[in-house]
Amino acid sequence: MIRNVTIPSLQQTEMLLQQRRTRLFLLVPFFGTGYILSVVFHLLSWKSGTPPSTWVRLFYYDGLMLITYGALWLLLWGETHQRGPSPTRTFWSLTVASLLFLGLGYLVLRIGRPSGDLALSTPVSGFAYETGVPLTWAAVVQMNVLALLEALLAFWLLLQLRGLVLFKRTRQSERSWRWMLITMAGSALLVDLFQPGEFVLALLLSLPVGLMLRNAFRVAWILYLTFRQKLLNLGLTVLATGALSGTLAFTSGPAHEYVWHYSPALSSFVNLSLAFGVLYLVTSFLSLLFHLPTTGAFQRKVDELAALHALMQLVSQVFDVERLTETIVRLPVEAGVAQAAWLALPDFQ
């Protein structure tokens, strides 16, 4: 007996993943198993002292990374997609997350170092120069932990900024955001196949950079902030920009070697995400600064619209006899003039 097999649509899949219990049941095993297998992969490489073949790394390991961190992205997306856009909460959470990452990253890089060596700028390489195989167990631990921390920060950053970029969302803005993520992931997956100076690599990176610039100017949420809120967010953007810039310097500096040997695609995606975060914060700071003088005029416009809306409601109530009589009776009681009120109307019938 042949049965029809129905494939769920994209909307049905999103609705399924929005259910927290279902999401955890489906995605946590994928992420946990994939991450453990990646740790085992690098431990075997360290024990054998020989690098895996190109085909094994391309089809097995890169595919494993795609499934593992794809599951992590969906897990974080499910926890944050229902939150409304709040610039104050977003900038503050990014500042705290960046500082927490820097502190944990510093502690991870201290693993295996002498207790008296406090400078992380000392060029201590834990990988073979020609093969890239980890030379010590500490390098295996560092590369796996730093990769997870960087992925968590990059995914959290993008998911937090998503609410601000898609404020007053349109179909065009959603399409631009999705294409930015797709080009960032696509160029990161292909970056290991080309040399740094090749024209094709520069062309691949130009696509996400162009879309990053386009999405960085989507700051429509600024128009709906009060003067006090704009001042508060102005200070928070400075803090978040400084913390995120320090994080980008850390991921492209001391931690770059470890995450690059873990996965060049993940390292490239993280750096692109952090660069977009810094770009969006700088754009937000400049936009907030330029919108400060116009706050009063915008607030007056909002008040005028509110007064006009109230007038329209009052006019509509005048033409509604029942609502008009109800308002006349209710107002003296609400004003405290009388404890009770009534209205006698003649019956013209």
Residue ranges and their predicted role:
Residues 53-58, 199-203, 263, 267, ...:
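Non-cytosolic membrane-interface motifs at loop->transmembrane helix junctions
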Residues 257-277:
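Structural signal for the N-terminal portions of transmembrane helices
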